[in-house]
Amino acid sequence: MDNHTKEQRHDNMSHIRSVSKPEVIVRKYLFSQGFRYRKNDKRYAGKPDIVLPKYKTAIFVNGCFWHQHPECSKAVLPKSNTDYWLPKLEKNVLRDKTNIAILKQEGWNVIVIWECMLLKKKREETLKKLKKDIEDNLKLN
């Protein structure tokens, strides 16, 4: 049962935006390194957050809770309204797996960056690895 009226829920949800801080961090880094990309390109399965056509690479910047990052403390199932949350989160995970499989089958390099990997203590290492993975994929193709 929802604790809010329909109007309150609508107002709350209308303030949620698709652009997240982790996504902005990744995009700014890629641009600073000379990569040019497309955002949320609908032509590709799952509408990846970032698409680098030249490198045939699709990047998903996933929130640990929403996409249920395995073994992450941020991916805890809420204690209330579990009848709603469990199926919703399971559906998100299944959709992610399906979209990644489709992209890989089409020959794309798929990189998933988790929100927790962009915290300050891991950010530099994560972004350097991202750059290396993108460049390595170009060499393979």
What is each of the regions a protein language model found here?
Residues 1-112, 116-141:
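Nucleic-acid endo/exonuclease domains
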